[in-house]
Amino acid sequence: PIAKTDVVIYTDGACSGNPGPGGWAAILMAMGVEKEISGFEPDTTNNRMELTAALEALKELKRPCNVTLYSDSAYLVSAFNENWIQNWQKRNWKNAAGMPVSNRALWEEQKQHKMTWRKVRGHADNPYNNRCDKMAVNEIKENVP
């Protein structure tokens, strides 16, 4: 079997109002190559943009990889590192309060990769996180009159 490629991904999401217009961005790095992607949604939430950034980045990968994903979103990182998803599945996609889990379809899309989720401080000294933040905010600026 072919060895899985090691990929590092940085992501960020931004929202002007919550809900409101939002942007997401990601930087993917593998085998010495960097790729930047970003996008816009006219009516969304900050959590949805954080999650969309991660999943759009994962969609760029053409085969299963060893992924280390860095995000400043406690919501995103905790969902994976604290077994929220497994608990939601056991409760038929209901959260601890018995309400349907938001963004279920997005959560279910990340299964094929070996994932490591890492929390970084937002708006701090990480140049990749700061670049993603700028890209996500620019998506809003470019798409909202």
Regions found by a protein language model. Give the residues of each.
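Acidic two-metal-ion nuclease catalytic site recognized across multiple nuclease folds
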Residues: K141-P145
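RNase H catalytic domain
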Residues: V7-V8, A14-P21, L55-M135, I140
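A short, polar/acidic, helix/strand-boundary loop motif
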Residues: G32-M49
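Acidic, metal-ligating active-site segments
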Residues: P21-A30
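Short amphipathic alpha-helical face segments that pack within enzyme cores
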Residues: R48, T52-E56
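Structural detector for hydrophobic anchor residues on beta-strands
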Residues: I9-T11, W24, I37, L51
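A short acidic-Thr-Gly-centered motif at the start of a beta-strand
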Residues: P1-K4
